[in-house]
Amino acid sequence: MPALLAADEFLAAARQAGFTAIDLVPPEHWARVKDCGLQISSTAGHTSIELGLNRADQHARIEHELRANIALAAQWGIPNLVCFSGSRHSATDAEAAHITAAGLARVSGPAAAAGVTLLLELLNSRVDHPGYQADHTEWGLQVCTLAGAANVRLLYDIYHMQIMEGDVIRTIERAIGSIAHFHTGGNPGRNDLDSSQELDYAAILAAIAHTGFDGFVAHEFIPKADPRQALQRTFAECGQALDGVQPE
């Protein structure tokens, strides 16, 4: 929930703008979201971005947290749990991919039975999360392949991957089979999706829609001005970008 608005004000503004779901909702607000008639599109699967799935000594803790959150997600109708690779350590990238995949595989079965997808989030290690391991799409795809479960997929954060590798549309088109969720944000600054930043979100969203993607595109940006107006403008402009786009 953004600091610029109280939770109830934000939820009312989001619904009025036309949004159907709220992303990354902390548990204390779940009832509020449901009472507003909105869906919760994702929540955190486990604690700690830095100490994550790329460390075998963290797997027992993370499995315990994920199993508890899988049960809660099933109870509250939350389709996605966000997971983190953790920061780089002594393991090579290849070794860390195997370790991360093994950690996700430990809980992919219970998650699938509950109708929950485990999202490995791709973050940038250049600006916001120094040392984070899952900082390139290719590494994330390798983890998904190694995990060998249809419900272990990627959270492709457009802002983060623009910083790390660019070539956003072509990457999305190539990797869409392993992407289950998107985050947006203007670059630089993670602010509004407007002309002051470098990403062409109209083209990106149209490309996503053209693939037939049917999951959530969650807006994770910090508005520079009135958050209510930002919500309304973003929903309207994204709708215009998708108008008339036909999936393949």
Describe these PLM feature segments.
Residues 2, 26-28, 46-49, 87-89, ...:
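Active-site-proximal loop/turn and secondary-structure-junction residues that shape catalytic pockets
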Residues 52-153, 163, 246-248:
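Active-site acidic/histidine proton-transfer and metal-coordination neighborhood
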